[in-house]
A protein has these predicted regions:
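Feature captures hydrophobic
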Residues: 1-272
Length: 272
């Protein structure tokens, strides 16, 4: 594998660690079956992969993240933990990224026999992440809600980290912008509304949950419903067509909305 390909795989892995893993908090909070399964669970689950030692600051040739579960609460730390209860280790970054994209890749599992119940729960939670895949088109109302909520939360966090990890295109896009808020909001129906935002300021970025209250959004993507958001996310309608059909309305700059949509498409290609 060429160095540029390895760098790309490392960036993708870090985006999974920083943007995809944290959205596991959504099913932990909003999916009754997942919430019940992890009630009372206090454990450390680690994902790791071998890579070129030159890609790691300490020369160890291993990268990873640890998920710390504490009675339904989740903390994700992008580092290797000394005493995890369960380890899913991959022979390469490509193999790990393949599995996290919903493909076939077999990790080496340590602690699975001793903590078999934890392994089953972890695999079930990973299956919830696959709801975000473009090929996953759930019919169940709760799963449709989870798909949209996780996708909106992940993409805003991924955009910020895409910038922080130094992607040239993203860095160029953020570099000369003043303090701006890119807001996303969704009418969640029976499950409740939700929102997330990306803040851009002079090359710096930060993602957050909810409606940003201290500044009017520079661009606001308003999805009228979960079904409307799914129609756009699943590309059942083109973005412009989605506006015409009332699936989404855009307040603010259409030019920058289109540019952000292009960047989101790049990230979707990396993570799904």
């Amino acid at each position: 594998m060429m160095r540029s390909d390895m760098d790309q795989e490392l960036m993708t892995a870090r985006l999974f660690f920083r943007a995809a893993f944290p959205v596991m908090k959504v099913p932990l909070a909003d999916d009754p079956a997942i919430a019940k399964a992890f009630k009372g669970v206090r454990a450390h689950v680690q994902f790791s992969a071998d890579c070129d030692p030159a890609l790691t600051p300490d020369g160890s040739g291993r990268v990873g993240a640890c998920l710390h579960f504490d009675d339904g609460e989740l903390t994700v730390v992008e580092e290797l933990f000394e005493t995890p209860d369960l380890v899913l280790h991959f022979p390469s970054l490509k193999a790990m990224n393949t599995l996290l994209r919903g493909g076939l890749a077999m990790p080496r599992i340590r602690g699975g026999l001793k903590n078999f119940g934890l392994l089953v729960k972890m695999l079930t939670l990973l299956m919830r992440l696959t709801l975000m895949l473009p090929t996953n088109r759930p019919k169940d109302p709760l799963k449709r809600y989870l798909k949209v909520k996780m996708s909106i939360y992940m993409i805003t966090t991924a955009l910020s980290n895409f910038n922080r990890l130094g992607n040239p295109r993203m860095r160029e896009w953020t570099a000369k912008q003043p303090d701006r808020i890119y807001q996303f909001s969704v009418g969640g129906g029976e499950f409740g509304d939700f929102a997330a935002y990306l803040r851009v300021r002079g090359g710096q970025t930060k993602a957050g949950r909810g409606l940003y209250a201290r500044r009017r959004p520079f661009v606001h993507f308003r999805f009228t419903s979960v079904d409307g958001a799914l129609a756009v996310l699943l590309k059942e309608v083109a973005f412009v067509e989605g506006v015409d059909k009332g699936c989404v309305s855009i307040d603010g700059s259409p030019e920058y909305a289109a540019q952000l949509n292009d960047l989101m498409a790049v990230l979707q290609g990396m993570l799904t």
